[in-house]
Design a protein with these regions (language model features):
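Positively charged
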Residues: 1-193
């Protein structure tokens, strides 16, 4: 299976809209079929603790995302959407904190429609429609934004973004200190053995 890696937020591939997906392009990028791409995407998403991931977040030029697959969210419901389009959204909106694998440890309060309808192709190339509500609706809307070139940091004021960045940097620093502490601890335990 092909190994995919998250790319940094300043990479232009993360910040630009993606052309429609084609199976020919899939082969050019070294995947045997859609299922292999889906498997690779879910693997990366779960490795980093995500609940959604688009191809441009791993540097691939595919109009596709995966979402869900965690027991605690919509009973493990998951999607792999190729060439997704939002058909409709509800007037009712919900504000909630969102995170993003492209921006580790950053959480921003975002308002989105409570419900939405997506039209997409599945891994077999069949056209489907999904009526989504709640968390899965939010996840798929967030991933769709990536596909059309919108990053979630664009949906917030500069002040709120600066505050979120500051909190993220504190968390990253704490994680780094924890990692260093564990390395020292591991060396000390090895010495005592």
């Amino acid at each position: 299976m092909k190994e995919l890696k998250l790319i940094p937020p300043n990479d232009p591939r993360v910040q630009s809209a993606i052309a429609p997906f084609t199976d020919e392009l899939l082969k050019e990028e070294g995947f045997k079929d859609r299922q292999e791409l889906v498997d690779c995407m879910f693997l990366v998403m779960k490795k980093f603790g995500g609940i959604g991931l688009t191809c441009n977040q791993v540097g691939l030029p595919f109009n596709m995302f995966v979402a869900g697959g965690h027991e605690g969210i919509e009973k493990g419901m998951s999607f792999a959407m190729f060439n997704p389009m939002i058909v409709s959204v509800s007037k009712e909106k919900i504000r909630m904190k969102e995170g993003c694998l492209t921006y580790p440890f950053m959480f921003i309060d975002i308002e989105r429609p409570q419900k939405c309808v997506f039209k997409f192709e599945d891994k077999d190339g069949n056209t489907k429609e999904a009526h989504l509500d709640g968390m899965m609706s939010r996840i798929c809307q967030h991933e769709y934004d990536h596909i059309v070139g919108i990053n979630f940091i664009e949906n917030v004021s500069k002040l709120k973004l600066d505050m979120a960045k500051k909190k993220a940097m504190k968390q990253i620093k704490r994680m780094e200190e924890y990692r260093k502490f564990n390395q020292v601890l591991d060396k000390n335990q090895a010495w005592q053995s």
